[in-house]
Amino acid sequence: MEAKDRLIVALDVDTRDEAISIVNAVGEHCGLFKVGMQLHNSAGFAVTEEILSMGFPVFLDLKFHDIPNTVGKAATVVSRRGVKMFTVHAAGGREMLRQAVKGAREGQGERRSGGPLVLAITVLTSVSQAVLHDEVGLPGSVEENVVRFARLAQAAGVQGVVASPQEIRPIRAACGDDFVIVTPGVRPLWAGTDDQARIMTPAKAMEAGATYLVVGRPITAAPSRAEAAKRIVEEMAEGLARR
């Protein structure tokens, strides 16, 4: 996979028109587009289907977290739609994760084509050590909890996780080279940190072993979105070369 194919551009906008404008601007410079709760709740599945119809893969980041049966049925629905990846919360437990994988396979079978990757959310990149302890109430370090969630997800048949750059190497050590790691919280040196607490540059994240990087505002808020995407891909390629 080339560096370009590993870049996921986050469509964290309110409207279909804004999203499609970004797709048109950077589609040739990235591998996938992420549709999250903000855009999905505004524009519905229609925008995902439109992006798919344009020939671009979609990472549907809705972070399912419910009882196992409900998550399994939701997984079947999104698998039928043809998305390449979707997310569930590892904190939902082993059975919920298993049902997500099962549901994705059932949806894949109905489509008779390659099904989506199921990705487990570990610890959100906005969560610091203090928040994890004092507000969420989990003992142990952020890294320990991320690795624990990653192992749980892998044992349940989930193909990968979403985790911050700082946890890439520990996850690789725990889960092996074939486990998919999708990494948000990536910021080039020329962009701000926004609301991410655990960040890293694109080059460093790829060097550490990330499979895909998710980048939003450094691209979507740039004066030239295409140029920003190209600069990030160049940095990613540098990191890949140093692995």
From Swiss-Prot:
Pathway(s) this gene product operates in, as recorded in its UniProt entry: Pyrimidine metabolism; UMP biosynthesis via de novo pathway; UMP from orotate: step 2/2
Reaction(s) catalysed by this chain's protein: orotidine 5'-phosphate + H(+) = UMP + CO2
Keyword Lyase on entry: yes
Principal EC category: lyase
BP terms from Gene Ontology: 'de novo' pyrimidine nucleobase biosynthetic process; 'de novo' UMP biosynthetic process
GO cellular component, one term: cytosol
Top-rank lineage group of the source organism: Bacteria
Chain sites annotated for binding substrate: 12, 34, 61-70, 125, 187, 196, 216-217
Entry EC number(s): 4.1.1.23
Entries under SUPFAM superfamilies matching the protein: Ribulose-phoshate binding barrel
One Pfam family named in its UniProt record: OMPdecase
InterPro entries tied to this protein: Aldolase_TIM (IPR013785), OMPdecase (IPR014732), OMPdecase_AS (IPR018089), OMPdecase_bac (IPR047596), OMPdeCOase_dom (IPR001754), RibuloseP-bd_barrel (IPR011060)
Assigned keywords, A-Z: Decarboxylase, Lyase, Pyrimidine biosynthesis
GO MF annotation terms: orotidine-5'-phosphate decarboxylase activity
Active-site residues annotated for this sequence: 63
CDD domains from the UniProt entry: OMP_decarboxylase_like
The keyword Lyase appears for this protein: yes
Signal sequence residues: none
Family named by the database record: Belongs to the OMP decarboxylase family. Type 1 subfamily.
Free-text function comment from the UniProt entry: Catalyzes the decarboxylation of orotidine 5'-monophosphate (OMP) to uridine 5'-monophosphate (UMP).
Assembly mode: Homodimer.
Entry-linked NCBIfam families: PRK00230.1 (NF001273), pyrF (TIGR01740)
UniProt protein name: Orotidine 5'-phosphate decarboxylase
Organism: Heliobacterium modesticaldum (strain ATCC 51547 / Ice1)
Gene: pyrF
